[in-house]
């Protein structure tokens, strides 16, 4: 299987999000990279499903709450920016203050 660097990055991100989901299911609080991976994966998969940029910007804030992450993580993540592929092209989705 031959993947472009972009495809490799997406695959790594998807796997990181899956690891984060497993840890979250075990009751563990997520660290910074895990939280970012989970939010990013939510946006990428939502774009693939045909959701709009506005929908993803709003729903990206509902993926994780303060109780889901380690102390200090919400303050470390001011924005998550994801370049996602939509049916009508690639767009930048910014989720402001994703952990509330």
UniProtKB/Swiss-Prot annotation:
Compartment(s): Cytoplasm
BP-aspect Gene Ontology terms: urea catabolic process
SUPFAM superfamilies xrefs: Urease, gamma-subunit (SSF54111)
Subunit structure of this chain's protein: Heterotrimer of UreA (gamma), UreB (beta) and UreC (alpha) subunits. Three heterotrimers associate to form the active enzyme.
Protein name from the UniProt record: Urease subunit gamma
Superkingdom of source: Bacteria
Main location: cytoplasm
Keyword tags: Cytoplasm, Hydrolase
Species this protein is from: Mycobacterium ulcerans (strain Agy99)
Protein family per UniProt: Belongs to the urease gamma subunit family.
InterPro entries on file: Urease_gamma, Urease_gamma/gamma-beta_su, Urease_gamma_sf, Urease_subunit
Pathway it works in: Nitrogen metabolism; urea degradation; CO(2) and NH(3) from urea (urease route): step 1/1
EC annotation from Swiss-Prot or TrEMBL: 3.5.1.5
PANTHER family in UniProt: UREASE
Reactions mediated catalytically: urea + 2 H2O + H(+) = hydrogencarbonate + 2 NH4(+)
């Amino acid at each position: 299987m031959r993947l472009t660097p972009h495809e490799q990055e997406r695959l790594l991100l998807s796997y990181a999000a899956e690891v984060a989901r497993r840890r979250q299911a075990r009751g563990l609080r997520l660290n910074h990279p895990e939280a970012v991976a989970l939010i990013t994966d939510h946006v990428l998969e939502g774009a693939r499903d045909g959701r709009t940029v506005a929908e993803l910007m709003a729903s990206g804030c509902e993926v994780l709450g303060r109780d889901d992450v380690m102390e200090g993580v919400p303050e470390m993540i001011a924005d998550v920016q994801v370049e996602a592929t939509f049916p009508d092209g690639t767009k930048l989705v910014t989720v402001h203050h994703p952990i509330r």
